[in-house]
């Protein structure tokens, strides 16, 4: 067993929520699995959402199976990756800001003057440690590209305005990895359905250093629905509070971090 670890960051990031109104586009508070495998797909040169699906199916010699609901190539090939995401922030999420754009091309808006004002919510200075379980051929290819600093396309954080910086890549071998089942602390994001967050017990010892507790929770995309091509969401949590492993999930101790793959 091997685990690849690397860090990814950027000045800004924008992981668009599909449930938005006309003028303000919101972002998810963290990178999610679909966005992450999209970045990895770009590194490997796989087709994305905007690539002509017909070309993809011709390359696969399955032209007769073309339909509107075929998944992007990166999703087909990488959705089975086991990943863990650890936000490198004080409270599990990142500051956000609103960025305003003017689109003055004539066809952009039916309003007088043809000027469309668009507002986007961006994450500021996001940074994550990413872990990938090396248990299949695609994972091995990704490890080769990341460790050797190779990429077919430039990776970016949700939008091509936000370039991704990938660094500090390393491989952990089996003798550097420990499997846990009863630990009370999880580093990074985990599915809410797998763990129960416990209330902290008060400690009577005055000398114990106080740690400010936090709990970040958000519904994040975990897969794409075959019929609708829309995100399917799961509730994720990131916390420094104690947790109970209620579904007997395997926890991996890698370096100083306890992580859960999904």
Regions found by a protein language model. Name each.
Residues 13-15, 45-50, 137-140:
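Primarily extracytoplasmic ectodomains and periplasmic/lumenal surface modules that are beta-strand-rich
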